[in-house]
């Protein structure tokens, strides 16, 4: 669980977002350490709890709220031989040039080489004549 700040209009349990890095006003903000200091650029986060604390923010149209976030499970295509529920593997993206499947091939929030735990096999997917497994994974830290 990570504590961070999000714009009050976005502060809703269940909302997912990608953190892309600090905005210009963040570089001099006194709350930057708690707001962006706990987030990794390029990672996906899901709000699990909104606390009743708010702060002024020049970036988020007035105010930000304190929230608790986690990295959610993410769906990704994988070679069938690696798709074993419960196993932990180093993520290797598959080759698939179908634009409709781009978000499953290289989903935002995951990077090549991440250590992930396979939680569930969701579906079988074909791309370019090859068969892959669509799996739900959770990134393992450290």
UniProtKB/Swiss-Prot annotation:
Checking InterPro entries in the record gives:
UPF0179
Q: Which family does it belong to?
A: Belongs to the UPF0179 family.
| HAMAP family noted in UniProt | UPF0179
Per its record, how is this protein called by name?
Answer: UPF0179 protein PH1477
Organism of provenance: Pyrococcus horikoshii (strain ATCC 700860 / DSM 12428 / JCM 9974 / NBRC 100139 / OT-3)
């Amino acid at each position: 669980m990570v504590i961070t700040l999000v714009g009050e209009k976005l502060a809703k349990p269940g909302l997912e977002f990608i953190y892309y890095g600090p905005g210009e006003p963040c570089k001099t903000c006194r709350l930057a350490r708690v707001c962006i200091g706990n987030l990794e650029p390029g990672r996906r986060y899901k709000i699990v709890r909104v606390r009743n604390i708010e702060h002024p923010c020049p970036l988020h149209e007035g105010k930000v709220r304190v929230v608790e976030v986690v990295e959610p499970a993410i769906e990704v295509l994988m070679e069938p031989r690696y798709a074993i529920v419960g196993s932990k593997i180093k993520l290797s993206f598959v080759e698939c040039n179908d634009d409709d499947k781009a978000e499953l091939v290289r989903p935002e929030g995951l990077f090549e080489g991440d250590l992930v735990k396979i939680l569930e096999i969701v579906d079988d997917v074909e791309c370019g004549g090859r068969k892959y497994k669509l799996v739900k994974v959770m990134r393992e830290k450290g």
